[in-house]
Amino acid sequence: MTQTLSQLENSGAFIERHIGPDAAQQQEMLNAVGAQSLNALTGQIVPKDIQLATPPQVGAPATEYAALAELKAIASRNKRFTSYIGMGYTAVQLPPVILRNMLENPGWYTAYTPYQPEVSQGRLEALLNFQQVTLDLTGLDMASASLLDEATAAAEAMAMAKRVSKLKNANRFFVASDVHPQTLDVVRTRAETFGFEVIVDDAQKVLDHQDVFGVLLQQVGTTGEIHDYTALISELKSRKIVVSVAADIMALVLLTAPGKQGADIVFGSAQRFGVPMGYGGPHAAFFAAKDEYKRSMPGRIIGVSKDAAGNTALRMAMQTREQHIRREKANSNICTSQVLLANIASLYAVYHGPVGLKRIANRIHRLTDILAAGLQQKGLKLRHAHYFDTLCVEVADKAGVLARAEAAEINLRSDILNAVGITLDETTTRENVMQLFSVLLGDNHGLEIDTLDKDVAHDSRSIQPAMLRDDEILTHPVFNRYHSETEMMRYMHSLERKDLALNQAMIPLGSCTMKLNAAAEMIPITWQEFAELHPFCPPEQAEGYQQMIAQLADWLVKLTGYDAVCMQPNSGAQGEYAGLLAIRHYHESRNEGHRDICLIPASAHGTNPASAHMAGMQVVVVACDKNGNIDLTDLRAKAEQAGDNLSCIMVTYPSTHGVYEETIREVCEVVHQFGGQVYLDGANMNAQVGITSPGFIGADVSHLNLHKTFCIPHGGGGPGMGPIGVKAHLAPFVPGHSVVQIEGMLTRQGAVSAAPFGSASILPISWMYIRMMGAEGLKKASQVAILNANYIASRLQDAFPVLYTGRDGRVAHECILDIRPLKEETGISELDIAKRLIDYGFHAPTMSFPVAGTLMVEPTESESKVELDRFIDAMLAIRAEIDQVKAGVWPLEDNPLVNAPHIQNELVAEWAHPYSREVAVFPAGVADKYWPTVKRLDDVYGDRNLFCSCVPISEYQ
């Protein structure tokens, strides 16, 4: 045997698991594109002046088992205290049936945002259920399909209040003093760039302040008080002030709906519905508003529509509000939200139903009543007479109480003057309450749970009678049927089967990087050591998290060529916003706050101008030349015209046209020459890692889509993570946090997310990916992603022209197929091709972005040659079908493309088409068939007849 022991140990085994084509397949594809090796291909495509001479030093690869063992040892450093800190985060009991069949199921977590509704009906139904939960609990008319977290939802509510306000000259936003501090932090950050003045005061003093356009109230208050805001809201409404309420989703099960009290906007975190705290996230926020404000709402909204056969079908509604269409005029820069987490919360509500939720909420409240009664019986004073689950307890010996709590491995809220906060949750037991008595009163308190229970059961006054809900919730059949595990398992499976995810087929979406989310990467997110930590626990209890985050940040620094990384932004859009704020504050620190012009190429993703607008900048568009590259002449002219007002440029690399622009360094130099900063959008980082880096190119700041390049799954539309890398001069200006000091960051800036490290519990996914790939594997992943894209481009270019290419006719990691000539010749559009691909078992590529009338294809490195060939064969077969239309064999108004997709029912229905059933549903010999459950959606009907809540079950049958 000639192999060494090191070779037999094969520490790089995961690289071969992650990268789809094996060595032989890679060579076949290299031969097809006319390159000798991966290095030779990279050398041809990537400009030589930006190629790294040595790979980033992120270590050697590790096997899946070694990496898991290493991360487990790190996770074990976290201390799992019982946390009663509250402040919007509580422990939960995630039903195992949802854990196993959704959170651990690639059929749910590897799907993409449901832009293609025909292959997304399952998660769209779950999201519609989430919206129904929101509507029932808030008492309002219109709900979104989730936002990023409660604090960012508050910032969105403020912005929305200003948009809809009739008080056009008012510029002040009032925040009640008992709003969660992290929420206030994020609101202040957003208000600064919008030029709003934030006033913080007791809610009852709001009428003392003038020029207020909006008010934010908290129900229940951060220290536990239940407020009856009915009269106050009525008075505010009479003065045309827009009222927003941040609400506790579990408390709303028992309390009067804020919408019934007159609130215009209600939002909050859905974390309590089954989603672990995870050191801060990810969690879905719910958001609801009055019907009259629906077109000003942020985020995705799922609506009920019809398909081509007239059957009920679901889709994302009113997309004209969103950043990918309205750009800087969009309601928000929100792109990805928190679909996977919203669906967990949705199914939690389905599984428990109204009876189960009331039982949970009443149990939490009863235990809180028992705790309150015992403490008061022993002479302790409560700050609030009315509460749901949180007590604010005045204590004389606060230091002693906190010391006893620490000894008992209990976290209490400690930032309240002369008091401690205690928030109970669905995991709290009578034994926990007895332990709390001992912490607060000493071991010899003599209290008994059953005795106290009898007292409070007959005489509980902790919720005002006027604040008790008097209407029924969750009356729709979906919330009253699936309560056995068998029924729930089958319901979830029925939803999963309606969708197309990576566990069934390649998802070739350009600019989305739908790569493998490996099982080994996903395993740690359910470890209790990561899942159960409160984001505001003492730092010494989170040493495992701190070590993992620091190590991941160090790797990202080396991979990006930056000097520091901030982990707080919990989406790519938030990363853009945070990066632009860093630039803004940097200019202000140099007395150049007047620099507010952001240059953005015409090809940019819609989030870029939307984020620039949110950061208080003016957008100036830079033209692209005929080859799709930034027009340097126009760039120089625009930069010179901006002069001392130039803030930055936002540029994507490789470009959104799928090309490594040769002049990228010159672009950076021009902007720097005029005093601007370079924001390099990290959306296409998968074509940079190990080959080049933003810092080496000359950029100053980038966000990194960990849910693209670094393997966090898309979750059907979230979660995402968008940490930012910065050069040293921008490091003092990254987001900070008002509750937790972020170690290693000397920033005094406000927060952009509720938690200091954003969605911390999914960071282990990226840690595992980098650890298992090592420097060698990461570079190879980028190279194979480039190879796969060029292989597709070379094989399809005769049938579908590749719109933009770089040097030697090559593309980067994605390519744009130009459908416009075919449409002119035949009338068949990119939409028809996208829908026909469903019949072949594929999710469509990205449609009409960045160029209308095109399809953008990104295969990633994870797809094998077999799958690439299957996609190519499907596209070529579709081209042959188009030729049939062109030749007149099939009429333009009745052919397999315009009628696509085809569903099972059509196999047994009357058939009057000029093509066969076999051509319709088994084209080109498709064997492993994916069946969509609806035909093509009627988008116009959906927006004209907007309906965003659950429809009768019969509509789905």
Swiss-Prot record:
Coiled-coil segments on the chain, per record: none
Record-level GO cellular component terms: cytosol; glycine cleavage complex
The protein's required cofactors: pyridoxal 5'-phosphate
The keyword Isomerase is assigned to this record: no
One GO molecular-function entry: pyridoxal phosphate binding
Protein role: The glycine cleavage system catalyzes the degradation of glycine. The P protein binds the alpha-amino group of glycine through its pyridoxal phosphate cofactor; CO(2) is released and the remaining methylamine moiety is then transferred to the lipoamide cofactor of the H protein.
NCBIfam families for this protein: gcvP, PRK04366.1
Entry protein name: Glycine dehydrogenase (decarboxylating)
